[in-house]
Amino acid sequence: ILYHLYEGGGVRIDGPSILMRKQVGPSTSFVTNYYVDMISSASIDVITTASPYSEERTQWSVGMDYLRGNTTMSVAYTTSTESDFDAKTYSFAVSQDMFGDLTTLTLSYALGDDTVGRSDDPLFERDADRQQYGVGLTQILTRNLIATLNYQVVTDEGFLNNPYRTVRYADPTVPRGFSFEPELYPNTRTSNALGVRMKYFLPYRAALEAEYRYFTDTWDIEAHTASISYTQPWGDFVFTGKYRYHDQTG
């Protein structure tokens, strides 16, 4: 059982999460998760109109892991519901340990089926499909050092706009003198991401982790993200400090 809370920039997000796992036999396990985000916000638009904003997102997921020799196969289904967005995701992954369990190769695939709506228009409904392909390689380099390399491709197709975002323009044909036009984005998008992570285990159960991620897509967005973190267990608690740098163009 977990309770999460984030507060900053006029936004508060909190809610519970319940995770249950059941072992069935020596090779199979099932897992289910219930997760809730309760969001209250006061963005610049909300502040200027003096109107508070609240939202709740509920997510359910169920999955199964099957171990055979040095191979682990996983399947999962996740559904997420909120007032203006419904998402269903089907995923599959297979991992293979090799070379004396020092190397792990992981292949993954996920299919997303989303429905985009508007909270102020019950008749508005648009579809968006998403496919995600991933490959990962984890290598134990020394007794204390482990490295992971991940590559991911995501293809999106369908309604990729923000349904609430519009542009106001002068329109002499209407009495008020202006009209609104919804934003227009391409209905396809392909993104690529490459990430590398290294973790070094220190004395007293501490660990130092460094990570870098490069992202690019067909909408001419390019991003670099780097982070470094330090983890120190102390009794029943685990303390983590992290610094993250992000640079994006496009």
Regions inferred by a protein language model and the residue ranges of each:
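Outer-membrane beta-barrel translocator domains and adjoining extracellular loop/strand segments
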Residues: V11-P16, N33, S43-T48, F85-A93, ...
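Extracellular loop and loop/strand-boundary signature of outer-membrane beta-barrel proteins
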Residues: Y3-Y6, V46-S51, A76-S80, S91-A93, ...
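Solvent-exposed loop/turn segments connecting transmembrane beta-strands
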Residues: Y6-D14, S54-E56, T79-T89, P186-T190, ...
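Short glycine/proline- and aromatic-enriched beta-strand/turn motifs that initiate or cap beta-hairpins
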Residues: I1-V24, T28-V31
